[in-house]
A protein has these predicted regions:
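Flexible, Lys/Arg-rich cytosolic regulatory linkers and terminal tails that connect or flank
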Residues: 220-278, 391
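Conserved Rossmann-fold NAD(P)-dependent oxidoreductase catalytic core, especially the SDR/UDP-sugar
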Residues: 242, 358, 362-365, 369-421, ...
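N-terminal Rossmann NAD(P)H-binding glycine-rich loop of SDR-like oxidoreductase domains
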Residues: 279-299
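Signature of alpha-helical transmembrane segments in polytopic membrane proteins
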Residues: 1-134, 163, 232
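Conserved Rossmann-fold cofactor-binding substructure of NAD(P)-dependent oxidoreductases
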Residues: 335-355
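NAD(P)-cofactor binding segment of oxidoreductase domains
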Residues: 217-233, 303-310, 370-397
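Strand-loop microenvironment adjacent to phosphate/nucleotide-handling motifs in alpha/beta enzyme folds
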Residues: 6, 264, 269-273, 426-442, ...
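A solvent-exposed beta-alpha-beta segment
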Residues: 19, 23, 30-32, 125-232, ...
Length: 606
């Protein structure tokens, strides 16, 4: 219905209600009286009619969408009616010196009941009849706090929503059996599976954006038992900043099931390192590198250099940052290979960065077993080139992105990352630059990680391939890993290897099961197949070796590990002679070097 038609309809309806109310009010007190023989009542009716329409326009009673009527709309009706009656009483007093108090009181009551009833009846009709005729999914809302009730209200008010809330669950005992917008709190989160059956629930929305850690993991696991579709609210900060609305639900991701409390950052110390400075990120097009760029830009650097050898990935992160930050600071995309020493020196000399985040590396374990020379070239020589250039041109802080696979490494990739750590620790002894490394476990969602592989296998009907039923890994999210890198740079005094307390390791088998269930399938439908441990893989991973001292946390959940350094000549020998070595010989050399074995004498003897 157009606004003009709506206005005409409500104007005529209200006119009838006004005249009917004053007539009935007088008739109740003075039955069988001829209404037209009482001049004051005619004057009062005209006054009430005119004043009602004036105040109705003043309080926008003709503009409101009454299908979404609530307490605010009722208050507006009461104000408009009360003021209309007050004006009528004033006119009666002026004309006759008397006020028909009882008539006006009855008129006031009928007026509010009929005006309010006419407006709210449409909402009741829509909620209880029209919505039932739609094909809507019965929805359970987990959490009856501010977020949960906001979700319920928006679902009830959105006539096009596919979801209709039928129940809440909440662990606050005081809310038990309370109703919010007509939806009852029927129990706590431990009853989710039973509530789903009792109320024929087809959809679950988890509306607890502030809850963290093991508690949210427990709630997700309770929801998974029900085998219905599960969604969750966006993050509170995203809602507050206007990035998303409260009803833009997202799928539950495996990252949500980690149950990890995020690391709280020292924003002030990070800001001092970044704001107004020139920042260089190598590997800027990769999963970790691109996220470091996003996080860095939040702190308003003077200039950010996006360095990488893949033009497509650099182009994508460049465009993303330009669209987000416009002309707030300078963004410079640089296509370069960290293996090209001359090019890296040119870049450092030209731009003179204050902070370098070195994320460029080969990270795929099985691939590097087959390509050890490429691993050395990129992870060892590439790191040496960037770190040496940083030293030469006075970079204040250099942060190496390392891996938990550098601890007691059993593969080429982990060994080259450990040797890269040794290189920057050696430089830290004499350089004015603060060199640090950051170790963390597997990053969920990064390119080449297990999650994208599992998702692809599920999409094709399975089975999901797991190397071993008992294999475990430490996991963290890409944003968390990137923030840790930035925090390490802020904490750096030189030569440290920072390690994150990553909580409990996760079984890959459990990860696969959770992902299958979150995708809406049963384990039996998709299946899990064991493929065996691949070359270079460990059953279990560590964050610190036995010979590394685990000190007290230097920051909440961040520790410093001390490592044993190898003689510099052994690393120099590797860099000078790796191209001449056979693959098996090179594999043995880097593994021995990374595990603090005397490899130089053996290599020279051969």
């Amino acid at each position: 219905m157009s606004y003009q038609k709506r206005l005409s309809f409500l104007f005529l309806l209200d006119s009838f209600i006004v005249l009917f109310s004053i007539f009935v009010g007088y008739e109740v007190l003075h039955p069988y009286t001829n209404f037209y023989t009482v001049p004051l009542l005619i004057i009062s009716s005209i006054t009430l009619l005119i004043s009602h329409h004036i105040f109705a326009f003043s309080y926008s009673l003709y503009k409101k969408a009454w299908e979404y009527a609530s307490v605010n709309e009722l208050v507006a009706i009461v104000k408009a009616v009360t003021l209309s009656i007050s004006v009528t009483a004033l006119v009666q007093f002026i004309v006759e010196g008397n006020i028909y108090v009882r008539v006006l009181m009855l008129t006031w009551m009928f007026h509010i009941l009929l005006i309010g009833g006419s407006r709210f009846s449409w909402r009741m009709f829509r909620d209880h009849y029209i919505r039932k005729t739609l094909n809507q999914k019965r929805t359970l809302i987990v959490g009856a706090g501010a977020a949960g009730t906001m979700v319920a209200r928006q679902l009830l008010n959105n006539k096009e929503s596919e979801l209709i809330p039928v129940a809440f669950v909440d662990d606050d005992f005081k809310k038990r059996n309370l109703q919010f917008f007509g939806v009852t709190v029927v129990g706590n989160t431990k009853r989710i599976e039973k509530v789903v059956i009792e109320h024929q629930v087809e959809h679950i929305i988890i509306a607890m954006p502030s809850i963290k850690g093991k508690e949210i993991k427990r709630i997700y696991e309770e929801c998974l038992k029900s085998k219905v579709k599960i969604q969750t609210m966006p993050m509170v900060e995203d809602i507050m900043t206007g990035k998303v609305s409260v009803n833009q639900f997202r799928e539950v991701e495996v990252e949500d099931l980690l149950g990890r409390d995020p690391v709280q950052l020292d924003m002030e110390s990070i800001s001092k390192k970044i704001k107004g400075n020139t920042i260089l990120v190598t590997g800027a097009g990769g999963s970790i590198g691109s996220e470091i760029c996003r996080q860095v830009c939040k702190f308003q650097p003077k200039k950010i250099l996006l360095l990488g050898h893949g033009e497509n990935s650099i182009y994508q992160i460049d465009m993303e940052l330009r669209n987000t930050y416009k002309d707030e600071f300078e963004i410079i995309p640089i296509i370069a290979d960290v293996q090209d020493q001359k090019r890296i020196l040119e870049i450092m000399e030209l731009h003179r960065p204050d902070v370098v985040y070195h994320a460029a590396a080969h990270k795929h374990v099985p691939l590097m077993e087959y390509n050890p020379k490429e691993a050395v070239k990129n992870n060892v020589i590439g790191t040496k080139n960037v770190a040496t250039a940083a030293d030469v041109f006075g970079v204040r802080t250099f942060v190496l992105v390392s891996s938990d696979k550098a601890v007691n490494p059993t593969n080429v990739m982990g060994s080259t990352k450990r040797i890269a750590e040794m290189i920057i620790q050696e430089l830290a002894k004499t350089s004015q630059t603060k060199f640090v490394a950051v170790r963390f476990g597997n990053v969920l969602g990064s390119r080449g990680s297990v999650i994208p592989l599992f998702k692809k296998q599920i999409q094709t009907g399975g089975p999901v391939t797991v190397t071993h039923p008992d294999m475990t890994r430490y996991f963290m999210t890409i944003p968390e890993a990137s923030r840790l890198v930035m925090q390490a740079g802020a904490l750096a005094s030189g030569g440290e290897i920072f390690v994150l307390d990553m909580g409990e390791p996760v079984k890959i088998m459990d990860l696969a099961k959770n992902l299958i269930q979150l995708s809406g399938y049963t384990i039996e439908e998709i299946g899990i197949q064991f493929s065996g441990i691949r070359p270079g893989e460990k059953m279990y991973e560590e964050l610190l070796g036995e010979n590394e001292v685990h000190k007290d946390a230097v920051f909440p959940k961040i520790f410093i590990g001390k490592t044993t350094l190898q003689p510099r000549e052994e690393i120099d020998y590797l860099i000078d002679h790796y191209l001449d070595m056979k693959e098996e010989e090179l594999q043995g050399f880097v593994l021995g070097l990374a595990n603090n074995k005397k490899v130089l004498e053996r290599a020279v003897a051969n």
